[in-house]
Amino acid sequence: MFTTKKPLLLLFFLGTINLSLCEQERNAEEERRDDDEMDVEVEKRFLPIVAGLAANFLPKIVCKITKKC
């Protein structure tokens, strides 16, 4: 009976270690993905502000350069 328990315990132990390593790798991938998503969110918030400022000041700058206001 003990001879059959020993391999089963070994398989259980190795499986537990394998699952632990997979979980750590998955968590690391999620953290990297979260950083990428935060960068995209910052870009989405930053670009409309820049576009709005450009839309306000570009006609004024063109008007002053060409002096056709």
Swiss-Prot record:
GO terms for cellular component: extracellular region. Disulfide bonds join C63-C69. Residues 1-22 form the signal peptide. It comes from the Eukaryota. GO terms for biological process: defense response to bacterium; defense response to fungus; killing of cells of another organism. Keywords: Amphibian defense peptide, Antibiotic, Antimicrobial, Cleavage on pair of basic residues, Cytolysis, Disulfide bond, Fungicide, Hemolysis, Secreted, Signal. Its main location: secreted. Residues 23-43 form a propeptide. It is found in: Secreted. Antimicrobial peptide active against a variety of Gram-positive and some Gram-negative bacterial strains. Has antifungal activity against C.albicans ATCC 10231 and a slime mold isolate. Has hemolytic activity against human erythrocytes. Belongs to the frog skin active peptide (FSAP) family. Brevinin subfamily. This is Brevinin-1CG2. It comes from Amolops chunganensis.
